[in-house]
Structures are given as structure tokens and as C-alpha cells.
Amino acid sequence: MKKLLFFALFISVGMNAFAQTDLLPHLLKLQGNWVGLTGREEWTKVEDEMVIEGISFYNVNYEEYGTNELPNEHSVIVYDNDHWVYIATPLEADKSTIFTCTKATATEWIFENPTHDFPKRIIYRFLSDEQLETTIDAGLGSGPKDVKVWKYWKKKI
């Protein structure tokens, strides 16, 4: 019985890891320059020997200030220990915040950190191949004042 339970657990973990890496082609859609009304996100796939599976994505989030564009945060999405994590580092921050992927589909990626003050969730939703919606909120059941949504369109630089 113990062998059967161990085997079932092994298969379950293996299938979860496969399911996570199997979603990589959908995450690759994130690559590129996404422009919104008040800023943009620029995502680049990075090959890094320090990253498990060699999969990571680097982002610089820019906010528009009048006619100037200033970076305000660096983000990385990495595949590590059989799951995806989103690591956010605001420019003025002393340390990074890690969000774990809790849902990943062809069109939606949800990263959560219930212990973080705000946001507790970061959601990337592909509305089409050329349109991306980013939402940050205070977790499930957030009120309207605790939800921020940005829409971006893919543009070539």
C-alpha cells in the first residue's frame, strides 16, 4: 500500500511539473513591448545558467511622467522547483517580493503572496495575442478600491 501511495504521489508531482513547463509556450506570448495609456511593460526572455530549466523572463515596468518615461519596477518570472514564481523589485525597495503562481492557463497567469501588504495577487490575462490586461489586488474578494487594472497593447519598438 505504501508503494502504491508513493507511486501515485510521484506521478502526481511529475504531471504537475509537466503541466507547468507545458504552459511555457503560452507564457512566451508575454515577450515584447506592451504599451498602455499611462506606461508600458517590456518583457524579455533571458537565458541564465543560474535559473532552473534556463527559463526566465525579465521585465522593466515604466510609468509615464509628462513627456518622460521612468522605470519604476523590475520583475522576473522564473521556473523554479517545479513552479513559476514572479519576483518584483520596485526601484526604491530594499528587497524583492516573491509571488507564487497559483493558476496558469493559456490565457491567464495568477501569482499570489497572501503575506504581502499590497498587492497580494498579480494577474496577467491575455485578451488576445496583441492585448494584455494586468491586475493587482488585495486578494480574493477585493473591493473596488483595492483593485488596479491596466490594459496594454503589443507594439514594436
Where in the sequence are the language-model features?
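Sec-dependent N-terminal signal peptides
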Residues: 4-13
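Short, solvent-exposed loop/hinge segments that bridge or flank secondary-structure elements
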Residues: 35-70, 76, 145
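Edge beta-strand at a domain terminus
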Residues: 20, 101, 126, 131-157
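Short beta-strand segments that buttress and anchor functional surface loops
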Residues: 34-36, 54-64, 86-90, 109-115, ...
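Contiguous, well-ordered beta-strand patches that form the walls/edges
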Residues: 68-116
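Residue-level recognition of beta-strand termini and adjacent short loop/turns
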Residues: 47-48, 105, 128
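Sec/Tat signal peptide C-region and signal peptidase I cleavage site
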Residues: 15-19
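N-terminal helix-cap/turn-to-beta initiation motif at the start of protein domains
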Residues: 20-35
